[in-house]
Amino acid sequence: MMASASLLIGSYLLLLMLLARPLGKGLAHLVADRPLHGFATAERGLWRVSGVENQGMRWQRYLLAILLFNAAGLLLLLLILMNQASLPLNPQQMPNLSWDLALNTAVSFITNTDWQAYAGESTLSYFSQMAGLTVQNFLSAATGIAVAFALMRGFVNREQGELGNAWRDITRITLYVLLPLSLLMALFLVSQGTLQNLHGYLDLTTLEGAKQTLPMGPVASQEAIKMLGTNGGGFFNANSAHPFENPTALSNFVQMLAIFLIPAALCFAFGDVVRDRRQGHALLWSMSLMFVAAVVVVMWAEVKGNPHFLTLGADSAANMEGKETRFGILNSSLFAVITTAASCGAVNAMHDSFTALGGMVPMWLMQIGEVVFGGVGSGLYGMLLFVLLAVFIAGLMIGRSPEYLGKKIDVWEMKMTALAILVTPVLVLLGAALAMMTDAGRSAMLNPGTHGFSEVLYALSSAANNNGSAFAGLNANTPFWNMLLAFCMLVGRFGIIVPVLAIAGSLAMKKVQPAGNGTLPTHGTLFIALLIGTVMLVGALTFIPALALGPVAEHLHMSGH
């Protein structure tokens, strides 16, 4: 088992880095806002027709463009979901969504969360899935990458204050990155057996004589961007555990690669943009070390399983509950860590059925801000916030003014960094407290005791950090939970984007200071250790008390302590 686990983790990381390096080079080209060879004329025509000016924006204008763009997407998606019964491509005659579920779903998809308080195959029409959810999967991913581009430019621009043009960034990211990759991914998934049609559902008679309905639909086209954009919202309720979404072991492995592909490539792009590849490599090393540690813990916990299984007469204590036999424990554990380290939230196994420790690690990966590779764009700018915090702590220890990449880190940057890092913990902890204090919150819990609290904590962690996965034992489709989680998703997304762009704008106004003898190297082993320690320390201080009431207590109870 250890050899299989090592081979799986090693082959995954090797292929990931081989694919991410060339993509990172292309992303760096987009950050520089240079026209692509052969597309310059078409681009100029597109900008003229759309009225987009070829000039940079300061951080306030960049932020306003991002907010207006996402507000328009929210309104359009809300209208589609609340009127889907009157729209085309609805062969199953799906009714309109209630206002609270429609609002929750619209907020979920424009924030790249893809939290789903519904079952897609029994709730949404094909039009809602294609024109509503799939479109927002592209646009929310492009938004995150655009913000990361703006922050990168903040580090390299000198006394300009401009961060690029948000409209150009979102358009170019969608056309040159997300669409081509999604097309290739969709074709691959179709070759593996993923559905892609507009047929009505099939009514069949099984060999036992029972009646069964097989859902159909344009699955592969949504599945591709769901993974590449770290969106995670499944066409079916079972998500990537469903054989119509994820048919084979090969499709499962490629889906895992797709989740981390753009986040890893952005780290390589960061090194190219700042003209020091070691900076990007340091981020990748930090992320990879934390990732491997998390995978090892989850695999160990699930293989060790539950000792009560043996007392009940099972052949093994290994925990196969909630997992597909075609994927097994190792692939399910790896997928769980990948999807929660990123802001994806897609699942090929039910996280609610993991052991207490096996479920706690994915929850904790979300709680630290999903900075272990993280979401497309959000993972990079989230980790760079921790880099600024680590540089500040190091500056306090050695008595020097903190600086990073030649830019001095002042009070303004640290205030914005602290604000961004504190947004999601406040949402999670206060939201969990509110849910446990109210009848409307507690009534949705289908399990009592420590595991019930873990389900509540997981839901708030997932929503506030824009992940979207869930412990399924929570009945979240109620007005209370739809509104609470929608609020957490909105604030968790844009409450971080605002200070990140403010930091980028401030850095873009500064001179680059030449490195001196006392400058802290931010690419060596010492800084990697400091960065990992900073992430771990913030996560530990913030969430250990809450985790102790949930998964830790559940594990001790399971172990007989």
Swiss-Prot record:
Its main location: membrane. One of its GO terms (molecular function) is potassium ion binding. GO terms for cellular component: plasma membrane. It is found in: Cell inner membrane. It is a multi-pass membrane protein. InterPro entries: KdpA. The chain crosses the membrane at residues 1-21, 62-82, 132-152, 173-193, 253-273, 283-303, 327-347, 356-376, 379-399, 416-436, 483-503, 526-546. The keyword ATP-binding does not apply. The keyword ATP-binding does not apply. Keywords: Cell inner membrane, Cell membrane, Ion transport, Membrane, Potassium, Potassium transport, Transmembrane, Transmembrane helix, Transport. Part of the high-affinity ATP-driven potassium transport (or Kdp) system, which catalyzes the hydrolysis of ATP coupled with the electrogenic transport of potassium into the cytoplasm. This subunit binds the periplasmic potassium ions and delivers the ions to the membrane domain of KdpB through an intramembrane tunnel. The system is composed of three essential subunits: KdpA, KdpB and KdpC. Belongs to the KdpA family. This is Potassium-transporting ATPase potassium-binding subunit. The lineage of its organism: Bacteria, Pseudomonadati, Pseudomonadota, Gammaproteobacteria, Enterobacterales.
